[in-house]
Every structure is written in C-alpha cells, then in structure tokens.
Amino acid sequence: MKGITFFTPFLSFLYLLCILFMTETEAGSRNGDGVYIVYMGSASSAANANRAQILINTMFKRRANDLLHTYKHGFSGFAARLTAEEAKVIAKKPGVVSVFPDPHFQLHTTHSWDFLKYQTSVKVDSGPPSSASDGSYDSIVGILDTGIWPESESFNDKDMGPIPSRWKGTCMEAKDFKSSNCNRKIIGARYYKNPDDDSEYYTTRDVIGHGSHVSSTIAGSAVENASYYGVASGTAKGGSQNARIAMYKVCNPGGCTGSSILAAFDDAIADGVDVLSLSLGAPAYARIDLNTDPIAIGAFHAVEQGILVICSAGNDGPDGGTVTNTAPWIMTVAANTIDRDFESDVVLGGNKVIKGEGIHFSNVSKSPVYPLIHGKSAKSADASEGSARACDSDSLDQEKVKGKIVLCENVGGSYYASSARDEVKSKGGTGCVFVDDRTRAVASAYGSFPTTVIDSKEAAEIFSYLNSTKDPVATILPTATVEKFTPAPAVAYFSSRGPSSLTRSILKPDITAPGVSILAAWTGNDSSISLEGKPASQYNVISGTSMAAPHVSAVASLIKSQHPTWGPSAIRSAIMTTATQTNNDKGLITTETGATATPYDSGAGELSSTASMQPGLVYETTETDYLNFLCYYGYNVTTIKAMSKAFPENFTCPADSNLDLISTINYPSIGISGFKGNGSKTVTRTVTNVGEDGEAVYTVSVETPPGFNIQVTPEKLQFTKDGEKLTYQVIVSATASLKQDVFGALTWSNAKYKVRSPIVISSESSRTN
C-alpha cells in the first residue's frame, strides 16, 4: 500500500505530461492565448523543483520564446504564454499551488526627513556616510520599480566602504546602462522583459522618474541646494544614506506585470537583500486572493528568507476598504502630509486674498487685473453645465475664456486640476482656479500656467464676489514655500484606507509616513516636467503612498544596520509600536477633512524615525504564525506544505481552524472581528525583551473604547534578561451591542520605553471579500 501511495502522484504527473505534450504538439510554436504564472511553492522542495524543470523541458522544448521567466531561488514555478486549455491541465498537476493569468499592477504615485526629525526630537541619519550605521553591517535595500538614473548626484558613492561580501547580485548592462553605472551606492541593477512589450530593447535606466525618486528617498546621498526650479529648496537626502541600493526594474510606462515582479522577488532573495521596497500594487477593486497575488507570493518567500517586505497601501482613498498589499507578512504604508506647504494664493479685486495650493512658475501680474469667470458661465454650446463647471475637455467657449482666469469645480469627483488647466489653457485663458476639498492639501506642479487649488469654504468667498461684482477681476500669485505648516501630519486624501478586504482581523495599513509633496531625485532628461528655456530638473516634487513606503524602508534599513540579527517581524514591530499619534499642534493626527484619524486611516500612527531603533519590546511573528494564518484562512495542509520552505515536520492545522482565530497570530496590532458584543473574546500576544540586558518591568495601560471592557493579564511583565519572551492575554467584553467598528490601544511602558499596539474591534466577519 505504501508503494502505491508513493507512486500515484508521480504516475498522475507523467499522465498529465503526456497530455501537455500532445497539446504542445498541436499548438506548435504559436503564441498562446495569454501569459500565465505557474506557482509551485517553495524552491526548497526537491520534488517541486524537479517537477517544474520536467514540465518546462517538456512543454517548451520547441517553444523557447513562450517561456518568459523561471522561478527557482526563493520559490518554484515559471511564467509562460499558454492556451487556456494548457493552463487548466497544468493546474491539476501534483505540486502546482496555483495557475493564474499574469496580472498588471500600478505605481502608487529632502524636507520630509527633517519633519520626522522634528516630530520625534531625534537625530535622523544625516551625518556623513560610513561603511555601516553601527560599524558592523551594511544594509542592502532591494527596490522593485521603474529603474534608476545612475548619474544623479543622489547616487554618488563618496566615502562609502566596499560592497558587502555577501552580495551576490549583478549589474545588467544595456545600450544606455553600463556596469560602470553601478558603484558602491547602486550595487545591483536588473531589468525584466514585459510580455506585453514587443521592444527588443531593455534597460535598468529609469525613463519615468518614479524609481529614482523612491531610491533617493530611501538611500540617497546628501545633495545641497536641491530643488524643483527653486521650490522646496534645501538638502535632499535619503533616510538611510549608508544603505546600498539594488534596483529591480519591473515597471515600464505600460505598467508592472506580475510575472516580472515574481522574477524580481526570486532574484532579490538569491542576491542577498535585507529589505524589499515596493511602491506599487493592484487596484483596490481587484480583490486578488493570496495564491494568485504575485506580491503576496513573493513577499511570503522573501520573509521566509529573513527579508522585510514594505509596500505602499495604494492611492484609492479616502473610501474605506481600499487598502492593498495586505498579507500579514507585508508591512503596508499609508501616506500623510508634512509641515511644508506650497501656497499659490488668489487675489481678488479689492486685494482680498484667498489661500490656494499649487506649484507653478508664471509671470502674471501680482495685481488683480485679469477678468474672472466661472466655468459654467463660459460653457460652449454643446457642453452641459456640469461639464463646464468642471472645465472638462471641450466644455468651454474660447471667446468667453480668452484672457480670463477661470474658476472650475470638481463636481464629479473624478476630475483634477491638471485636466481643467489644460482645457482653460487650450482656450486661451490666463489662469485656472480649481475647487476641490480633497486635493487642496496636496500640491501639484502645473508648469508655467497659473493654476491653484482651493477648497469649497474658500470658494464661497469667490462665488460671493462673482455674484456681487459687475466686472470681477483676480490674479494668481507665484508659489511660495511655507515652512512649519500646521497641523501636520494629516492623512492624505488619496491614501487607501482599511479595513483590509483580506481579513479584518489584521489591521491594515500598518503605519503612515510622509507621502505628500516629497522632493527627491528624478531622471535627468524629462521634458514633461521642464520649464521652457530651462534645463531639465534633476529633482521633482510628487505625492503618493509610493513616496511614503520608501520612508519606512529607509528606517527599516537603519534598524537592520543597528540590529543585524533582527528578523523582519521584529523590525516591523519596532516601527509600529513606536509610532506617534499626535501632530505638530499637539493634537491627534487628522484626516484631510480635519476628522481624527482612526487606525484604518493611519495604522499604528506616523513613523518615528529613530524611536524605532530602540523599541524596548518587539512582537515576533513566527513562521508558525503565518502557517496558522493560512490554516485559519482556509488553506489545507498539503497546499501549505508546498508553499513553505521551513514547514515543521509535525505541523498540522489546528482542529478548530476558522477565520476568527486570525486575531491570535502574534501581530503588533490587535484586530478582533465578528464580535457582536455578546460574551467575550480573548487573544494572546508574546513580546520579546530587546531593550535591557538585565531586569526590566513593564506596566500596561489601556485606551478602552466606550461601551467596552478590556482586561489585560498579567498587568505587569517582569523580564530578567535580554531576549526573554513573556506572554499576556487580552480579554474583550462589551456592555452593549456593537453597531460600528471601534478603536482603542494598549501600551506597555516603563521609565524608558513605550510600546503601543492599536486595537480594532469589529462586528463584521473576518473576511470581507
């Protein structure tokens, strides 16, 4: 019987190979219906690796061009052009975890480090670079993005030591990118073929700017007098100037393919990075499951190898349930404003000043001498009033607009000042004032055409002026940089919000960080951001959770340098439990509307750039925690075993596995779902002492939401040595039925440390998709 049991899967495998061979013979060398990813679990399994290689050899012997990527370092599998029938057959093969169409992902598109320094009253990594922050370890940050512009001064390697000997990566050459473009700062550069791109020319050089911006935010060398044509002038520097950069170019102007992202994860694991930073993700509506999400799959195997994976939360806010990249082994980052504002005010007749926001470089008069008109009053004959109010494309009459400043409104929620500007400019207008409560706090660059954004409260004054004045006039003032702007931080309107569609029992996002109007390196030849008659700017100011994630990646890199033996979950815990919840007005962090931010907006709070270096206690989420999560989520042991590199020999899914038990994995935040208010719920957490060599005592305090009782036992944790682990229980009960999600926190503290965990309690079921 044992022999039959052993050979049955293998015979089935051979049978399927025969079918595939016949399918391949019929298909010949033609292209398949589409690109599919075949995920076969951990590369540590010899059986999986052999099956993958046999399958590749059989299928693509005469179709080499259809095989796009093979995955063999951190996990097994491949990406290839297949027919739908071939994909179905492969999906039934023993050892195959999933087969799915290659998905497309989108990008989530200086002073910010000084703001974090001010907020936490600590020194950010701003001194001269050395070989390592603590003299013993160089951290290597892998970045999956659009490439890098190596000539930028932000990537000079002055005073940096030799490349770490453990580095196994490479610097791939192209026509415009030579091995000499890599140095002791940029130590690795790889590019990946996009199956949708027929071009034969590939390079790691950044032609978009996004990857260079992200890279310099993380690890850029200090560059004095950096600015965007004089705006945001100062010293541009990365948060971890000692870190090394390894660029994995997975995105081009057409987007980022999942097959390339997985290939980059596979290479990065083999190359030896310490941190992986991804400022990209799926759209909020995609609702991708774990075993068909290349980012979740790649991150799972990276974390198994001790690599922390940090991802942007997405730019689909402010609606709830829009956060992406929410697997529990990923650190998910929201975006907030900083204490710098770019004002471009509107001056009305009578010199009444209306505050506005925008970056432009116009030379219009500072006196209000230009006629002012509302978009609806300038509508073309064929346009609707609503379209004209928004200054939508082809909605305005050129004769009515010429020489005037036009007031436009975001009436549909999907239009932006840049599109209104283009319409006004094309019809001969002098300037554009755009009304939008959401984007008012996020400065965008509008080139040389006068454009500014105001909110509805400010717009009411302009409407009153228009209605009471026969010949209304106005002007738009040049951009002025305002420092020490208050209140800051505030969660950016675009930042995707929780709860996670994956599970409410894991709070997402994890943290928030600066992501609004961030100055960083750019490509050196981008005419689209250049001013007429001036050379291309080497730096650019942009916003997005794309800009927030690299701030966290930089701090994670610093922590890794100071604590090289810490694993990914310890670093994540250090960042989350030391986050701040207050702004520079000493009030609580708010959203773009002024409402107090909840953990669904900001996670544990705003990144603290150096308090996280010494957190006192950490929550270590173990491999078993993640395996149990997969059990609770509904995966069977066979699938989990195929996925895991370090699958314990005696591991089995708990007999009572269910979604509610996800709350029990050792995460730095506490999410309790499916709680209607009846009875009580208990979760357990374990903390590790990393702050003291000797004795340490911590006392708990609880921020309890109204209508609830939260009991923590024990109320004191007494550690006797460094590295000691202690466990506590949190028992939640309610005095009334739960009608909406509520928020609280618990903090373990002593005279030296405060270790805070947010708490979210929901009546909704754990899984919402």
Swiss-Prot record:
Summary of the knockout phenotype: Increased stomata number at elevated CO(2) concentration and increased number of epidermal cells.
A GO-annotated cellular component: apoplast
EC number assigned by the record: 3.4.14.10
PROSITE patterns (UniProt xref): SUBTILASE, SUBTILASE_HIS, SUBTILASE_SER
Peptidase S8 domain: residues covered: 112-613
Primary subcellular site in the record, as a coarse category: secreted
Record: active site: 145, 210, 546
Disulfide bond residue pairs: none
All residue ranges annotated as the Inhibitor I9 domain in the record: 35-108
Annotated signal peptide: 1-27
Localization (cell): Secreted, Cell wall
Known catalytic reactions: Release of an N-terminal tripeptide from a polypeptide
GO molecular function: serine-type endopeptidase activity; serine-type peptidase activity; tripeptidyl-peptidase activity
Protein name: CO(2)-response secreted protease
Organism: Arabidopsis thaliana
